[in-house]
Amino acid sequence: MSGTLAPRVPHCERRLYHSPRPRNLGRVTVNAENPAAHVPSWQDLPAAQQPEYPDREALREVVAELESYPPLVFAGECDQLRARLGAVAKGEAFLLQGGDCAEAFDAVSADQIRNKLKTLLQMGAVLTYAASVPVVKVGRIAGQYSKPRSKSTETRDGVTLPTYRGDSVNGFDFNEKARIPDPERLKRMYHMSAATLNLVRAFTTGGYADLRQVHAWNQDFVKSSPSGQRYEQLAREIDNALNFMKAAGTDPAEFRTVEFYASHEALLLDYESALTRIDSRTGRLYDVSGHMVWIGERTRQLDGAHIEFASKIDNPIGIKLGPTTTVDEALTYIDRLDPDRVPGRLTFIVRMGADKVRDKLPELVEKVTASGATVAWVTDPMHGNTFEAASGHKTRRFDDVLDEVKGFFEVHKGLGTHPGGIHVELTGDDVTECVGGGDEIFVDDLHQRYETACDPRLNRSQSLDLAFLVAEMYRDQ
């Protein structure tokens, strides 16, 4: 979703492994009057992490209704993002991907969406200047309402109920009624995603994303942050660059609007498949629930339904790679998902843990590079660094998050490859979920504003700390 509402771009010749091209393209549009024109081949394969709906007929009715809904994004926007990610894969751009661990229906408000977007824009401005390359901004937003879980049930005080799997599946409250998977929530996810996208489009085109305004926010952060003195030099350099351009009479349109794209984990395959459409330009399939989708660590089985689904759509695809990932697996993902080797099609999002990334990542990068594939390498420094505090809160240490990013950069520097970006769980609010940071959060502070429905997120200050510190790393590359 760009600041210019993503004008259509020419569609490059692409893969031929999708379902057969419809005979009469004039009758099939991106709005999918006939979304069932493709055969959902994933349905014949094992699908991990799917809800157990007690009323299957109700699910079928909801899916049929979703199939009639208009797209949330357009194929041309997905193509545009693929081109931007192609630049990331070739070392010509940097990806900033961030947002909630799991979005919540009751958090779809103007203030919370604005604060999240504001934080990402501030991070992007710092990284753009320091890296001297375009920063592709992608939110974990407008669809991240589902979460895979390690256990299917939860027990409290002798009572066992289904695990909370995100607002798209069931309720957070620990009672039988709330925890029963309800397919009606899929429709609510669609409408909440549409409302969020609408507001983000307004913010990114209506002056809120003006680069000079974003820089002013960063100046305020530097002044108020305990770590501000460390960041002051970089902030001053950005200020001088903007003042020079103003004095020279330069006022490009890119200063006033911003390209911003939406992504989420493609977890609930009934929902994703119902929102898969045939593009009238090309006859190819797109998942129009978001510009980019990724397959998670728990659902990336090569013989599973999620990889099969991802292989049939033309969106940019991400794959989460944990420390157990083998070289053969990585190369097979490329063969399955990017057989034509199109830069920007495939992003490897690495979540190794700070203690493993320096040992586990080099061989993967080395062998994938030697294969001739051009993928974008991105670090997720969050998921491999979670622990439980004595209070029972799941949390992460900011220093561990930073160390995994450092290890990621060190590996790429040693191999002469491009550290393509960061994928972070964050919020624009002043929560107390991760410990550490410049404006330090202590373990004993976690209870004060621990608001996440699932995993701990960096707060606004910690997110901006991370951006300035990653900017320093990029300059050292």
Predicted regions and their residues:
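N-terminal amphipathic/basic-hydrophobic helices that include classical n-h-c signal peptides
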Residues: 1-31, 35
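Long, contiguous, compositionally biased segments that the model treats as domain-scale units
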Residues: 26-170
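Glycine-rich, charged/polar anion/phosphate-binding loops
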Residues: 80-82, 303-306, 333, 362-364
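Short coil-to-beta-strand
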Residues: 91-92, 377-379
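Active-site-facing alpha/beta catalytic cores
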Residues: 102-103, 108-353, 393-396, 404, ...
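Non-transmembrane, aqueous-exposed alpha-helical and coiled segments at domain scale
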Residues: 330-333, 345-377, 383-432
